[in-house]
């Protein structure tokens, strides 16, 4: 009977622990663990504008014009699209208003892309 009771308590504990919202995340050595972000555990296209602490989650902010990120990150800012062209593909397209736009595709992460007006990129 005791083993059934202990098993039941263990089972309920697992449900309670796994079923609850585990946010906010406690920092580990001053940094959040990998993938501890509020947007589906991902931060591509955003940067960590505020790292988590014991009371709040990491806050992700979208990258601005001419910048991008393609992976989960703890970066305090987005990367410039004018940087390492060997890792980034730039594609010019014609927009509806006939002004060319730039789409940035990361070779490491082809799903991550950012579109912005060409006039903002040199």
Curated annotation (Swiss-Prot):
Domain of life of the organism encoding this protein: Viruses
Start-end of each TNFR-Cys repeat: 42-81
Entries under SUPFAM superfamilies matching the protein: TNF receptor-like
Gene3D superfamilies: Tumor Necrosis Factor Receptor, subunit A, domain 2
Keyword list, A-Z: Disulfide bond
Induction: Expressed in the early phase of the viral replicative cycle.
Disulfide-bond pairs as recorded: 43-52, 60-78, 63-81
Free-text function comment from the UniProt entry: The protein is truncated in this strain and presumably inactive. It has similarities with variola virus CrmB, but the product is truncated due to several premature stop codon.
The protein, known as: Truncated CrmB protein
